[in-house]
Structures are given as structure tokens and as C-alpha cells.
Amino acid sequence: MGLLAVLLALSAVVAGVLSGVLGRAAFEEGSAARRALTVDGTAGAEIVTRRAADPAVQDETVRRIIGSCFGDVPVEATRDVVADPAVIAGASEAEPFARWVIRPEPARITAEHLDPLARGATALRQQLRSSEVGVRGVQVLGDLEKTATAAARNLAVARALSWIPSGLLAIVAALAVSRVTRLLAITRETETLQLLGRGATGGQVLFANLVEAGVVALVGSLAGSGLAWAVLTLFGGVPVAPVLAGGAATLVLVLGCVALAGIGRLRGPGRDETSRLRAGRLRTAVAATSLALIAGGAGLASAQLLRVGSTIRWDRESPVPDWLATAAPALLLLLAALVAVALLGPLARLAEAVLLRGRGLTGALAAAQVARNLGAFAVAAVATVLAVGTTLLAAGYDGTAPPLQQRLRNLTAGAPVVADLREADAEVGRSASQPSTPVWRYPEASIGPVKLTAIAADIPGLAAVSGQNLPEGLGTQPPGQRLPVAITPRLAEETGLAMGDEFQIQLFSRHLLAVVAANVEAVPGTTRSNALLADAGSLRRALESRGAELPAPSQLWLSPAGEDPREAADRLRGMPGVSAVTVTPTEAAPDDPSRLVASRFRSAALGSVVLAVLGIGAVAFTQAGMRRGQVAVLHALGADAGSQVRGRVLELLGVVVFAAAFGAGASWLLCRALMAGLASGVVAPGTVSLPVEPRIEPAWPGALLAVFAFLIAATTWALGRVIRGQIRDGHFREETP
């Protein structure tokens, strides 16, 4: 019954972890979709046209088109009549306009609705233009198409990147189940020998084990998945499918591992010494070959990730996982776990030899037991390496990718507050009463066939409001009325320009002679990789030399000092000449892919720690049952309870501490080498490449590892209680086959 209880707990925990992670991912995606559509009020589309002679037929036609465009997507369409020119230009009491407002129903929207919603908004515009709905024209206004398209793209990126933590968790779960079931099979070897000795065939024993394991695994999977579903329901509910998928995967995994472990143990009994030696050499060869294959796969995957610089590729504007690069973190951590197991035996024997020279025997005996029971202690070592490694890798992603996304947001906006200007008005800048600078944007600039975005401003003022270090000297006009500019590395690569090169640039409808005066990592106000920065004064003089004038600035950038940016934005909105004001968000958007993927990493880290505690507990208590006779013998030889408990705890803690240190070191190296590629998956193609500085988030990983350490301490305490109970039991009799 004890072994069945371990198998039941294993099935329940694995099912709970997998169902919880999959269900939480589905819940977060649905929540992100709903919040993305309602972050600034519910996104919607407006159909505006003059009211037809027969309004009922017109309304029926519009609703039929809406239904054909959006299909099963839950949207609500309302109609009203507008006769106020302040609402719609041209409307009047004599000739009112009909308006249909289409909004998604947030309570029913799921992540799967975003793509059809975006396509429907695009199709709506096309179908209305070719229909007879409009009376002297029809307009489709609103931000539904733009918002839904951006949200669908962000969630697609998050899903493509989520295969990284999903792969880590899959490796952890598979190894935990396979190692623990193998340990259980070893524990039941005596019982297997008894059944074979009484005439049972190997097939009958295997079938009985599978039936027994199937019933236990089914009960455990249902219990674990049910508990996960109940917990997730408290936070708002999730679809049943992901939860059931976690339970089904657990059942298949447990049965498969039980079958493999059973077949392996059935081949062992009844063989002579020569066969056993041959089998041992074969296992060693298989282990070495597996290690070499995994090392080769990890090397290829890492090389692919370093070569392409990301774990996703773009196929027609759609993110697709690069499966080889995506597998790199999981394969490297798996390799680290296997290397740790390979080192565990030699290090244990070395520790035994060193400790034998000391006075006490407890440490030496503990090291000897680890060296002699590597099959059991390998479970604890692998589980600990993967748990600590996954947690620190998740901490590295959490500390690197979201800050990179925030830097891109800041770079796109340019400044904390950006006002779009309809016309030049010096009063706007003076009334802002904040550090501000006018900015000229020209996204249609070109150098020969190469298209680019040009930004011009007073460079010191731009540096002050954007917070970026910008090159000096762009305001100094070189001889010959050449325009000094700073270019991005990508633009330099595409045009072949280097420092001091002169070239012709099409800028503000004029061809100007420019010179590369500096290189700049990125240009404030755009994330485009092809970008150029110029000083507004130098640009004005260059245009005047060609008989042209610098047009009015397109934007005013502000960096409020001692004032909330939203208050500064509200004040700007009422000023003449201002068409729109944008405040750069300081928090991640609801559909920010880096935030969603970081959450997946945290779930994988939590799941790996739970599975590690289960694996270590299984090692401790199955070993306690298998070595009960050893406890009685040592007690008869004079070993007191305290020394035996200390020795057994030292065995377990020695393995766990070694594996934790090894996993932490491997994960740190992985973060330093590959985190730039993992974090860069959130960067869209054509976006400027910013340097990535890997940083490990310390808060939640520290708390999680502290809980892990506490649970290991509790396990050792419980193990000590079990051993003391065995010593007090005076009726123990070793069973013999």
C-alpha cells in the first residue's frame, strides 16, 4: 500500500501541476484579450452614412454584412441617428446621418476570438465600400481593427514563446515520473521475484502492474486535475479542455513509464553473473550514448539560437516557433542534470575516501551509501537540478524580457508625454511649463532605394526629454551646407555608409547633401531599424540653402518634472494647435507578450519545485522502506537513533545541496549565454536591435527557493521520525523470497 500511495501522490501532483499550468495559461490569455479590448474603453467600429429613404432595409443590410464579417465572434451592434454637426461633420436636422456602433462583448470574448475579430473588422470596411448601404459614401471609423490586430499579434507571439517554459516543464514532469516509477519498480523487485518463482509469467506480472498502476493513476489524475480546476475556478474560471488535457497527459505518462520500468526489471531477475555483468555494461553504454546524443542536440539547438538571435521566426507577419532554438534551454538543463548524476558517483566515492581519514564514520558511511545507491539518489539529483535551474532561468527571463519591452515602448514614444500638433504654435511650448522640445518626424525619407524614418529636433533638448544619450556635434554645420546626421547600425549596413561618408538623402521633399557624423544605437521616437537623427537647426539651414523652409514641427515632446504625466497631458489637450496627446505607459499592456511569457516561466518554476519535492520525498521514504533491515542491523551493532538519523539526513542533504549548486551554476551560465536570444523573441522584425543585459529577478525566485528549502527540511524531519520509529519497532523480520 505504501508504494501505491506514492504512485497515487505522483499522479495527483503531476496532473495538478500540468492541469494548473495549462488552465492558468488559458485563463491569462482570455483575460489579456478582454483587457486589451477594454483598456481605454471598449474598442469599437463605427459605420457612418447618410440615412437612406428606407431606414429599415438599410439597417437590415448593415446587420447582415456585420454578421457575415464577424461570424461567431460575440459582438453587439447598435444603431442611432446623428444630426449634430459637432458629432459628425455635415450632419444636420434636414439630412441626418445613420450610425452603427459595433463593439465586442468583453464578458464572452476569448483569445481565439481576436484573430477573427481583426479579420472581420478589415472585411467590414471592404464589404461596405462595395455594397449599396452608403448614401453618397460610407465611412468606417474606430479603433477595433487596429486594437484587435495588435492584440492578436501579441498573443500569437506569447504562444510561440511559451513553448520554451512548456518544454522545460514537460522535461521536468517526464523525468520525475520516469525516475520515480523506476525507483518503485526497483523497490518491488523482491515481490516480482516471488511471483515469478510461483509460476507467473513476465507478461502476467507486467499486465497486473499496468492494471494496478492504471487504476491508481486514473484516480490520482482525476483528483489532481479536479483540484486544479477548482482552484482556477476561484479566480474566474477556465475552459475545461486544458485541465482535461493535463490529466490525460499524466495518465499516459505514468502508464508509459510504469510499462518501461516493469519491462526493464523483468529482464533482470534470474540471470547468471555473466549476464548481469553484460547487462551492466550495456546500461553504461546506453547511458553514455544518451548523454552524447543529448549533448549534441543541446549544442545544435544552442548554436541555432545564437545564430538566429531568437526562438521565433516570422512567416507572413505571423510568429512561428523555431523548434530547434526553442528546445535549447530544456536540452541544456537536461544535459546539466545528467552530468550532475554522472558526477555524483565519483564525488561520493571521493568524499568517502576523504571522510574515512577523519574521526567519525557518519559522513563516510553516508557518502558510501550514496555511491552504492546511485539509482535512487539520481532521482533527487535530477529533480533538484531541474527545479533550481528552471527557477533561475525563469528569474532571468522575468528580469530581462519585460524591461526590454518597456525600453522599446519608451523608444517608440520618445518622451513621457507626446503632443501631436496640427499647426505651429509657439504658445504651446511656452504654456507647457515643462522640459519640452519640438520634434519633426518624416517617415518617408529615403537614401536611394532604402526607406527610413528621419527624426529632427534640438539635440540637447531631445536628449533631456527622451532620457537617451545622443551624439554631440550634429548642430555644427560642416562646410558646403552638408547636413550632419547620425544613423543606426542597420541603416549603415543596408546603405554601406561609414563615418564621414557623404550621401544624398530625400528629406521633406528635397534632396539634400548629408554626411555621417555619428552612429546611434537607436533614434528616439521610432523602433524602426532604419532610422536617422538630425539637428533641427542644421536641417533648417540645409533646407534654406536649397530654397526651402523647414515645415512646422509635427510633435511636442515633454518630460514633466515634479508633475504627473497625465496631468500635463490633460493641460495640453485644451491648448490650440494640439490634435492628440499620448502618455507613455509605465506599466505593461494587458497583452504584453513578455509579461505573459514571464508568467508561463513562473508557472513552470513552481511546477518544477513541486515535482522536485515529490521526487525527493519518494527517494527518502522508499529508501526508508528498502533499508529497514539495515536500520535493525546497525541498531544491534550499537548505532543509536541519533547517529542513524544524522547519517540518513546527511545522505539526502548532500545530494540535494550538490545538485542545487550544480543547477544554479548551469542556469547562470545559460542565462549569460542565451538570455539575449530568449528575450529578443518579443521584438518584431524590422525593429531596432537594442543590447540586452541579462538580469535575474531576485524577489519571487528567492521566496520560491526558500519554500523549497523549507519543504526539504520538513522531508528530512519526517524521515528522521520514520527511522526512529523503525528502531523502536522490535518485531521487524526481514522477508525472504
Q: Which stretches of residues belong to each language-model region?
A:
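Short, strongly hydrophobic transmembrane alpha-helices
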Residues: 2-27, 290-303, 375-400, 657-661
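Mid-to-C-terminal secondary-structure elements
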Residues: 459-468, 492-529
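Juxtamembrane segments of multi-pass membrane proteins
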Residues: 308-491, 499-502
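Hydrophobic alpha-helical transmembrane segments that constitute the membrane-spanning cores
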Residues: 168, 212-236, 516, 607-620, ...
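Membrane transport/envelope proteins' first extracytoplasmic loop
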Residues: 1-174, 183-186, 310-326, 339, ...
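Short cytosolic juxtamembrane segments of multi-pass membrane proteins
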Residues: 268-281, 724-737
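Interfacial "coupling" helices/loops that link adjacent transmembrane helices in transporter permeases
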Residues: 1, 175-214, 614-657, 731
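Short helix-loop junctions at transmembrane helix boundaries
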Residues: 222-245, 304-324, 661-707, 717-730
